[in-house]
């Protein structure tokens, strides 16, 4: 059992939880995720690690309420417990494998949409601790859907806000802001984009045109976090990959985003899942040969 040390409501449908998880807190790195199950009857939920405290043995996750399980999780409070908190899983951020010398040569910009801010924060924090400066562009529909603004300002060199309605920051999309910054003279060698699939697609279309290498984190398409359900299957270049096993980070210019979006639409229905299973045969799963997580 894992104790909830802190609960904070960030928006109407997004909340933050700090969980006492000594083993995960000791081993995790920026970019990794955990699988959470709140009780015996609960489904497995993959959640990206937003922050961790090795001294106090806690791990912070940010959760968007999009289904019955996340709604139920959102009703828990400090002092209550979660049944399973498994991790760290997935490959750490590419940044954690680079030397200080390599990082110093890069001008890095993060582009985050919605809850994509959560996995961006620990990467910015990692760079900050190494003395590396990086910018971040954050997008949301309106200001009441923006999260972790104050936290980002502590770890990023520049925080650029965009909202669809112009209620805060620049009116428009994150791609508009990125292109504007480049046109104004900003130079970036590396872009790390995390957010809705459609957002990452258009960021990658822009950065390919601008000649900026781009990494995307495919956390949003994961369902059970083990490769068993096949939901996070995607094509990268000409190879089949699974976000939860092989990622979640991939070369954004190699990802077939249209295929990902079509797959997500099909995966929402039982008929669609059956169709995908038949079409993809043995490549439907991440090597398990089962179809767990589809019930």
Language model features: what each stretch is:
Residues 39, 87-88, 237:
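Short, surface-exposed secondary-structure boundary micro-motifs
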Residues 6, 51, 161-163, 216, ...:
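Structural signal for conserved beta-strand scaffold positions within catalytic alpha/beta enzyme cores
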Residues 36, 84-85, 234:
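A generic structural signal for residues embedded in beta-strands
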Residues 71-223:
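FNR/FR-type flavoprotein reductase catalytic core
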Residues 42-51, 89-100, 243-244:
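Short, Lys/Arg- and Gly-enriched loop/turn segments at beta-strand edges
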Residues 154, 242-246, 250-295:
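Short Fe-S-cluster ligation motifs
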Residues 119, 197, 219-249, 283-295:
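Local cysteine-cluster metal-coordination motifs and their immediate loop/turn environment
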Residues 1-80:
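Ferredoxin-reductase
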């Amino acid at each position: 059992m894992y104790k909830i040390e802190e609960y904070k409501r960030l928006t109407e449908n997004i909340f933050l939880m700090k969980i006492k998880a000594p083993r995960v807190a000791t081993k995790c790195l920026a970019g990794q995720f955990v699988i959470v199950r709140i009780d015996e009857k609960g489904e497995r939920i993959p959640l990206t690690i937003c922050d961790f405290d090795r001294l106090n043995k806690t791990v912070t996750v940010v959760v968007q309420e999009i289904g019955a399980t996340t709604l139920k999780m959102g009703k828990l409070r400090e002092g209550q417990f979660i049944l399973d908190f498994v991790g760290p899983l997935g490959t750490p951020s590419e940044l954690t494998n680079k030397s200080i010398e390599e990082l110093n040569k890069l001008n890095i910009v993060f582009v985050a949409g919605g809850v994509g801010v959560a996995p961006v924060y620990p990467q910015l924090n990692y760079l900050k601790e190494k003395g590396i400066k990086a910018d971040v562009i954050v997008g949301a529909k309106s200001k009441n859907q923006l999260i972790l603004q104050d936290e980002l300002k502590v770890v990023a060199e520049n925080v650029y806000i965009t909202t669809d309605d112009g209620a805060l920051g620049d009116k428009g999309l994150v791609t508009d802001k990125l292109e504007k910054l480049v046109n104004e003279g900003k130079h970036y060698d590396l872009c790390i984009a995390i957010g809705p699939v459609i957002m990452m697609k258009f960021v990658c279309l822009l950065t390919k045109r601008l000649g900026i290498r781009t990494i995307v984190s495919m956390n949003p398409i994961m369902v059970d976090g083990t490769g068993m359900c096949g939901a996070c299957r995607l094509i990268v270049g000409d190879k089949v990959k699974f976000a939860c096993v092989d990622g979640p980070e991939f070369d954004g210019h190699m990802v077939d985003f249209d295929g990902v979006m079509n797959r997500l639409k099909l995966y929402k229905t039982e008929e669609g899942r059956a169709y995908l299973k038949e079409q993809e045969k043995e490549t439907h799963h991440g090597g398990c040969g089962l179809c767990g997580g589809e019930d």
